[in-house]
Amino acid sequence: QANDYKANADEFAGQLKDLDKKADSFTDSHKDVHALATEPVAGYLLQEMGIEDSTPEEFVTQSETDAGPSTKTVADTKALLSGKKVQLLVVNGQTTDAITDQLRSTAKTAGIPEVGVTETLPEGVDTYADFIGSTIDKISTTVK
């Protein structure tokens, strides 16, 4: 049994190295990319890919409250999209609301592409490596 654990751990470590290479490839070919996220679900992955998460801290903090972000905070956040200060909108498709819809609409009007992410493995994806790999692929094909 110990050999099985070791073999599985080695296989997983190899998959993680492949993911690092995939993320590094994006970083090498895309400089100064900024994203806005409806939720901080993909924050570590964006960082690993060299993408600056430009989501205002107030938006993140206020989004976690029952009241949600203030009108000013939403306006400031939308201004990042309409002013083309970011190149990507990252949307957690598992939790959307009216503010998410506003951000998506603003991004679409501004020509800012959107990529969907999830907090859990989507249907048809069985492994962590496939989950993260497919997210890297989606971001890579979305950001020009």
Locate the predicted segments by residue.
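Extracytoplasmic metal-acquisition and chelation regions
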Residues: Q1-K144
